[in-house]
Structure formats: C-alpha cells, structure tokens
Amino acid sequence: MIQRLIPLNRKASNFTQILEKGTSLLHYSSITEAKLSYKERLRNGIVDIKVNDAIDLFESMIQSRPLPTPIDFNRLCSAVARTKQYDLVLGFCKGMELNGIEHDMYTMTIMINCYCRKKKLLFAFSVLGRAWKLGYEPDTITFSTLVNGFCLEGRVSEAVALVDRMVEMKQRPDLVTVSTLINGLCLKGRVSEALVLIDRMVEYGFQPDEVTYGPVLNRLCKSGNSALALDLFRKMEERNIKASVVQYSIVIDSLCKDGSFDDALSLFNEMEMKGIKADVVTYSSLIGGLCNDGKWDDGAKMLREMIGRNIIPDVVTFSALIDVFVKEGKLLEAKELYNEMITRGIAPDTITYNSLIDGFCKENCLHEANQMFDLMVSKGCEPDIVTYSILINSYCKAKRVDDGMRLFREISSKGLIPNTITYNTLVLGFCQSGKLNAAKELFQEMVSRGVPPSVVTYGILLDGLCDNGELNKALEIFEKMQKSRMTLGIGIYNIIIHGMCNASKVDDAWSLFCSLSDKGVKPDVVTYNVMIGGLCKKGSLSEADMLFRKMKEDGCTPDDFTYNILIRAHLGGSGLISSVELIEEMKVCGFSADSSTIKMVIDMLSDRRLDKSFLDMLS
C-alpha cells in the first residue's frame, strides 16, 4: 500500500519514515480498492470521512494521471481536518510535496490549523514563513487560525498583538477571530479588555452575537459581578441580540448567589414572556437561591411548578436543595428530599451524600452519619476526602479522636490524599484531648508528606502547646514562622500573648503587644482582653485601666468580656466605686455580668464584703 503512494523516482524508505513520524498511516491495513474515480468520490461528498477511506482516496489521487490539482487535495485535507485527524492531514500534505504537488496558500492554512490544534505554534509559524517566502499573502482565515492557536496555548497577549498586526496589514478580523480572542481574554480573567474588543467589533462593522457575549457573561458571573453581567445583558437587548436559555440561566444563578432575588425573578419572568423556556439549571438556581434566603415556601412552590412543567429535577437540583436544608438546620426536610429523589430513580452523588452526612454530624447523630456512609459505599458511590473530613471532624468533636485517626488511616488505603483541612481537624482533636505528642507527630507527618500547613494549622498547634504548658516549644515555632516571612494575622499573636500571660510572663506579653504596630498588625478586642486580663492577673490594675482607655481611644469597642474582667479585678482590689462605674457603663453598652462575675459577687456577699444592693445593680 505504502509503495503505491511513492513516486517512481523516490525511495520507499524516505516516505515511510515521514508517515511514521507525522501520521498513523502505517497502523491501517486492508484498504479496499476504489471502485469510483477520485473525482466521483469528491463530487459525492466526503463529510465525516473515515480514516481508511481517506487513505484509500489519497492513494487513488496520487496514482491518477494527470495528477489532481492542489484544490482537489485541499478538499480532502480539509474534510479530514474536520474529523480532527491532524497527523493524517499533515502526512497527506507531506505526501503531496513528495509527489511534486505544490502547496498553495489554502494548503498551508490547513497545515497551520493542524499545527495550532496540536499546540505546535512554532511549526505553524514555520509554515507561515514558507508561505511568505513563496510570495503568498496570508488571508484573514490564516491569521484567525493563528489567533486561535495562541488562545489554545493561553498566549492571549500574543493573540491580541496578532489581531492588531492584522489591522495594520489591512486584514480585517472576522467575527470568528474576534469571538475566539474574546473567549481567550475571558479565560484569562481579562474581562474589561474583552468588553473593549466587543465595542471595537462594531467599528469593524460586525454585529456581536450571543456567542460573542457568552464568555464575557460567564466570566462576569463567575467572578461575582452579577450587576455588571445584568448591565451587559441589557446592552445585548439594545443591540437586538437574543440571549439563549443558557445565558439567562448563568445571569439568574449569579443574581441568586448575590442575593438579588428580585432581579433574578424579574429576569426569569422576562425570559418566560419572550417564549424562552426555563430549563432545569434555571429552576435549580432560583430554588436554591430562594431556600438560601429562607424563603422555603417559595422554593417549594417553584419546585412543584418545575415538576408540573415536566422539567425533571436532576441530581444537581436535589443536591443543591439538600445542602441548603442541611446548612439551615432542616435535616428532616433534607431527608424527605433525599427520599423523593430515590423514589424518582435519581441516584445521589458524592455531593448529596456528603451534605446528608454533614447534616447528621451537625445534629450529633454519628451513628446515622456512619449508616449513610455505609449506604453510600454499598451504592457504588466513592467517598471523597470531604466525606472523610466531615466524619473525622465529628469524631474529634465527640472526643473520639482515636476513631477519627482510624478513619484517617483508611484514607490512604483508598488512594485519597488528606488535605490541610483533614490534618487541621485531627491536630485540633488531639490538642483538645490533651494528646499533645500525637498532635505534634501528626503535624510532622503532614509536613513530611508535602501537605503545606496553613496559618490555621499553626494556630491550632500553638494554642494546644500554650494550653498544655509548652510555651517554650510554642515560641520556637512562632519564631520560625516569623523568620519564614509568613503573613501572620492578629489571631496568631493573640495565641502567643495569651500563652505568655497564662505562664505569668506578662512583661514579655506586654513587649509583644507593644511591637504589634511596628509589625503592621492592629490589635483587636481579643488582644486587648487578653492583655488587660494579664495585667489584672499580675496586679497591675492601673496599667489595665490605662489600656482600657487606650482601647477605646484607638476605636476598638470593648465587649462584655472586657467589662467583666475589669469589674472582677476592681472588686478583688477593693475598688468598689470603680466597679460600680464599670457596671453602669457596661449596662449602658447593652452588656451584662457573666457567671464568673455573679459568682464572685455572691461569694463576697456571703462573707459580708458587699451589700445585697450590689447584686441587684448587676441584674
């Protein structure tokens, strides 16, 4: 077969090597002999041509005398390219060249397209260079193909530059070129440039269509700019562009997520009036949005309307609703929805099961959560890392850290990789159970496995070390964190300052507190409370009062903890008048005495250090 493709004055091995490198021609055998001439076969149409038929036709054309024109070969190559057999096309082009059939600009554009589709832009530009060298002038189609090639490789800036070059060369970009570039810009998040390009399209004399606007709307909605998306939607209307149900659904979903339900419902009613029928995605977005906003009856009504219109809710619809019910603490309704989807023959997916397992765990129904987990596995639905993390977290909260650890070890055997959240959950569980060594070992395992600890991970470990009397170890880690130039929020500093105060190192805590402004970190109410508490514990009541005043001057509003700490400190220091003043100020601010303050007052009443009227003042 290969021999028949080779001109008499060439060696078989050369062409065979080319075909082996550029195509998979040699893998096809048993090619049937053509009964029709190549002209008849081309005339009869070669849409969706099969590989073997294409090779057979190419052989027939090569054997014909006189040889077919480049136009005939281009028709074949173009048809094969549409079937995405790019290597085969390039092999045909090489075969043409070997048989003395010159490539014209159309042939070379086909080759450029194939190389672009294969993400081999260097080869594409090599063909373009050859075209220029042969005196051919690339047309809009050639340039559009290269623009698409740049976009496929994510090289959008170069695609933009090429379009600008086209304009300079008096080659006007066509609608496909500009739409391709707009899509590429949107994929890179460069929406503002895409919008400018749409306006430029009008200058080029093109009318943008729904395909042009689609990527821009999608990107705006994904980035949470639903207001801008709605504005663009209105602009489409002004330009008499009819939006599709997909585009309506995208904008409606974005508006629902932003809480703009009135706008979402208005758009929904608008599409209905225009005769555009809502689909399962449209309804799912609206139902989920209404339920998220607590409008359960409206959501249920829309679900009934959806079913009444024979738009069957899919697993995505049910899963979204179940998740909303679980988050709102409506586990009973979530279970009813689950039963409904089973009745309708809709198989739950991992997201569905995860939501229900999470719901059971939040209600402290660990037994039911495990039953749902077992059911999930029995139905052939594989648990993911989220499933395991939910259960591990629930075990840890129930003080069953060892069970959580057993489940954690099961993760690896299932081929799953624990993430930062999974490790954080277990490290916290061990710390809260007082199993500090286990927490430290797990932290080291996390690091050795290449799972990067987050600031939250470090915070959990530092807090555990401080609470269990290992301040020095906590300070070692804290120092390493500072040297690593990790961005430390006020939460980390609060843990260390609190640990220092608990270890009676109030002066060290004060030094760290005073250095916060130099580090560009602003103290919050917790920082002030911890520091005021430390000063009170040390007996430095005047310094605590000064810090309380500074706290208010700096615009940090005291909370009930602040007042209760100071009230107890003043009562313990025989500062009855100042205690009364603080109580009155606290009540004006809408706070009340906590259990520790009330207990202290009752104790002082019992040994007659306070009058009963003081207790009445607290109420």
UniProtKB/Swiss-Prot annotation:
Cystine pairs: none
Family: Belongs to the PPR family. P subfamily.
A cellular-component GO term for this protein: mitochondrion
One Pfam entry name: PPR_1
PPR repeats: 69-103, 104-138, 139-173, 174-208, 209-243, 244-278, 279-313, 314-348, 349-383, 384-418, 419-453, 454-488, 489-523, 524-558, 559-593
Domain of life, per lineage: Eukaryota
Name used for this protein in its record: Pentatricopeptide repeat-containing protein At3g22470, mitochondrial
Transmembrane regions: none
